Amino acid sequence: MAMPLCSLTSYNPITTTLRGHHFLTINAYVKTQCIPCFFIKLHTRSSASKQRIIDLRSGSSNIVACVGEGATSLSSHSDIMKTGKREEIPPGVWKDDISDSIMSSHKPEADEKRVEILIAEIKSMFRGMGDGETTPSAYDTAWVAKIPALDGSDHPHFPQTLQWILQNQLQDGSWGEGTYFSAYDRLLATLACIITLTVWRTGQTQVRQGIEFFRKHAGTMEDEADNHQPIGFEFVFPAMINEAKSLCLDLPYDTPFIKQIIEKREAKLKMIPTDTLYTVPTTFLHYLEGLQEIIDCQKIIKLQSKDGSFLSSPASTAAVFMCTGNTKCLEFLNFVLIKFGNHVPCQYPLDLFERLWAVDIVERLGIDRHFKKEIKDALDYVYSHWDERGIGWARENPVAYIDVMATGIRILRLHRYNVSSDILKTFRDENGEFYRFPGQSERGVTDMLNLNRCSHVAFPGETVMEEAKLCTERYLWNALENVNPLDKWDLKENIRGEVEYALKYPWLRRLPRLETRNYIEHYGANDVWLGKMMHMMPYINDRKYLELAKLDFNNVQSIHQKELRELRRWWKSSGFAELNFLPDRVAEIFFSIASSMFEPELATCRAVYTKSTLCTVILDGFYDVHGSAEDIMLFNEAVKRWDHSLLDRMPEHIKTCFLALYNVVNEIAEEGRKRQGHDVLPYIRNLWEIQLESFTKEAEWSRAEHVPSFHEYIEAAAISSALPTLVLIGVIFTGEVLTDHILSQIDYRSKFAYLMSLTGRLANDTKTYQVERSRGEVASAIQCYMKENPELSEEEALEYIYRLMENALADFKREFLKTKDVPEYCRRLVFDNARSMQLIYMEGDGFKLSHETEIKEHVKKILFEPVA
């Protein structure tokens, strides 16, 4: 009779046989009696046997131990791998008591009425989008008010604008944007208003107060940040200073700031290419009122926009009209005043800009599903005015604007419109740097941030997009080095946070709910825009967007929490929790699907995906670590036969695995039959048989210490990653009736699915191969490539795998962006599975080591922590 191991109290050499192949001696030092874990010093006669397993049978217990040098632990077969590889996995982070304690008590039904109201109001905003809504510009209104009556009388042609100036002086004596103070904006608007009032000999009190404000602040302008200087300020401000002198206004003309601006203007005037000034539309058209002494107004008329304006600027158009009497200029100004009544904005129309930004906002805030028709109408409008030579902020704007172009390319491509990126070449100089307008050298953080976002929807071979990505990353990293980088054109409160997020999480690491959560925290309902003057755009910056986004996020999160509770109950009842193959990772796995396929109507898809993933992870561990060859053979046979007849021959842990899989698959198949209208059990069983064949092959490699060829490994990885299996089961519950054509676009036959699997496997391997190698697994992309290229170092092989993954991701993006005949949810399930893998393996194994990576915080923010 064998002596029980727990009775050993001193050194005893034990010799045993490992499956008839190796005779090994173990020197056992037992620290205590009759405890479930022992410490053993192991020696082996064969270095090749260091990672083999010793199977010591003591009574009815199975005791196994790794063979190798040093100390190890000894316990039952469910704790130690039968192939001799032990994996220490940290306990689950989200235990019931922890997750329940931080789950929200939010009740979605309490918000239903308010959500309905907000959706209706935002839909109304979309429907009301005409030529663009924007706030008044005191500066431009002052220029329009200067136009004399056409009948020759000593009155303004637009007297209502003069009245607006008189009635809209701010309390400090200035004019300008009242919600945000910028000295540049206030001085420029105030100077324009006091000049106009003086011209019409009215408003002496307002003029006096305006002069006092000007004198007070002009002396401090040397300390004002240049990045708040409006477009064309260095041209229009000195020109108005000269006019103020001619009107004998008592202003501090000798202050250093005014002298510097005048000198700067003189230098820039000499640099203006007069030969092209009248032939090519440029941003000079936006501020012609500051260039009257050098331009020929009659010649400049040929660059007038179809709507009669000069680059949508009322001030510039008013100046040209006063110089030429051009009737189209007057028609434009009449058109603007019919729209706004007694004032004008700093630029109008803004129809393309407004629509693109409104679509971008609702999408990034995660509320776009409520506005499908409105989004399509807006994008159809933009696309109908799309010009491959470039577009600006308005349909008839002759000067391309990189912010609009980059945002337009990105959004239109994501919605399957065919647009080229070639126009971006016109914004690039000879050094590969990109700027705001063609041929100019100004740019801002927002411009470069939107260009960076655009570069991530590049197709393979689009050189200009690759150059844009490199350029913008350089620029944005440099911007972050500033203590408080403020964008010259878009005065956002949280621009730093947006830049940091974009650089850390590029598009292929960005899951929809994480994007939503981040943007909710950074969206500014009161953000101010800076063009020629500061202004706000109510259809772009509106608290309704943010309020709806917060309510919607918390409502969806509450739904997800209920689903998670049900999944945790299932996890416990399945028996998986007792196996110790994998600590509780229900929350992390549910997060991976809920952060992408988040819509309430996809609840069954999320549950099915989570259960299937947990089955996959458990079975991967069983095949890879915990099961013997005989165990695996028995399990495969049971799955193929799909009945209970083999259960009596199975050890408990195998029986638990089979019963859990059996019940899950049958449950899914029954629900799938209702969704698809026919029996889907054979389809699902076939997927699992293919998956388990792949696991079996990798287990055989591991036992034989076989390193396959790189090609063989990559081909096997397309299945062993399990992503196709999970997608092809989950897609049954996306609300689509699956035809063979749809399946052919996302199953093993498709390049789309293959690239999803390949990139997922490579992301996994790059972060886990060292740990897996340390426990005896010899097959990974890195090791297989090194076997075929022995002259390479490990670092060089790893670098190659990263390049391979980047190229595959580029191809994968193209497949996603160009696939038109696959339903949206089906496409998203494939695409976001790949993105999820890129995020989860960004820092390491985000599933197994979630407590050490940012995955823990991501899970908390998406599943447990409501937005305030």
UniProtKB/Swiss-Prot annotation:
Gene Ontology MF annotations: magnesium ion binding; terpene synthase activity
Keyword field contains Cytoplasm: no
Gene: TPS-mPim1
Protein's recorded name: Monofunctional pimaradiene synthase
Domain of life: Eukaryota
Keyword Magnesium among record annotations: yes
Binding site for Mg(2+) 2: D620, D624
Species whose genome carries this gene: Pinus banksiana (Jack pine)
Biological or metabolic pathway of the protein: Terpene metabolism; oleoresin biosynthesis
